[in-house]
Amino acid sequence: MSACINGLCRAVTVSLLLLLLSFSFSSACSNGNCQLLDSCSSATDCVSGLYCGDCPAVGRSKPVCTRGQATSPTSIINGLPFNKYTWLMTHNAFSNANAPLLPGVERITFYNQEDTITNQLQNGVRGLMLDMYDFNNDIWLCHSLRGQCFNFTAFQPAINILREVEAFLSQNPTEIVTIIIEDYVHRPKGLSTLFANAGLDKYWFPVSKMPRKGEDWPTVTDMVQENHRLLVFTSVAAKEDEEGVAYQWRYMVENESGDPGVKRGSCPNRKESQPLNSKSSSLFLMNYFPTYPVEKDACKEHSAPLAEMVGTCLKSGGNRMPNFLAVNFYMRSDGGGVFEILDRMNGPVLCGCETLSACQPGAAYGSCKNVTVQTRTPSMDSTAGSNSGGSYSGSVQFSRSLASVAQLNNIVVFCFSLLPLLIFLL
């Protein structure tokens, strides 16, 4: 028997695919007048919220205006329980290809994002995945292995990024941020002390108020009124009692990350997680990123394949929409990207409409505005797919080219392939 109710899984998948497959047009415009998928040559060509980018992976030969910001769902439909919304989350949010190197050290690790935490938050990211380690007598953000941070896998002290989060919450008093920690911190009270020193304890959502049996979370309105606007989860169960940091898989289900999480037609649960259709946890984290991050492919991944996977995971979750969508290189797409998909995930749940932009504040559930979908055709050529380059500018300035960052990750793949031999020799 299908887990879908009234064909919701099929309807969501089909609407996502139709919208994303229809994104394609090229026209002459400039001076901030260019709309989504119009041809562009610089950041100033596109209207606010769009940037100028291309996607050779789908055969696009020229840059077009590409969506670069999420629509806040609470700005349209407010006052529902926190677990009714879907939020954008960045995988390894700290692993920024443009992050400064440590003095005298060449970093050897994978990169998953291309801009700062502050930029991510300003562009609508509301969930951050952070890997925290004991390093240099402090707690650092590292993209490492075997539970140990090295100088060539280290990025920066964790408090630096947490202070960016504090500044954002302070300046945006109605916003809620979630942090998920891959936790390799062993010092006593390390996490609780770290967050207090960053000034984030005043926003802390207490574990005692988190639903443990699959009930609804408090409404976003109540969370804002009580200033419980920071949710923090750890991968270490003992820290819930020791430090008051919630154990992640006690409160959410999660699909498998890496390549198993992007395999078409399959959405298995992560081994630490309960089954995705479990009723004992009211949050659902959907991972969608390959094991090895490849920048030039991200724009293609964030189109029809992701839209289809949302439908697959919706069905695996017992007709429950994911609450967090975690991706690499969140800005890269062939048009609407993860931002359009988020709208398509929020719309049916929040207001019964195909997309968030069709929702009408204060109207009855299912009362939707007519939304015009662009159906345009971009400039294409037969050789564009072989081009590994890319140009990106706009609300987020990428200071490295796509090709140079891809080369870094390819070098890391080679280095990590030699690691077992090096460990054996040592």
Curated annotation (Swiss-Prot):
Disordered: annotated segments: 258-277
Principal localisation: membrane
Lipidation (GPI-anchor amidated serine): 404
Sorted UniProt keywords: Cell membrane, Glycoprotein, GPI-anchor, Lipoprotein, Membrane, Signal
Propeptide stretch(es), residue numbers: 405-426
CDD domains: PI-PLCc_At5g67130_like
Localization (cell): Cell membrane
Membrane topology type: Lipid-anchor; GPI-anchor
Gene3D superfamilies: Phosphatidylinositol (PI) phosphodiesterase
Residue span, PI-PLC X-box domain: 76-232
Protein name, per record: PI-PLC X domain-containing protein At5g67130
Organism, scientific name: Arabidopsis thaliana
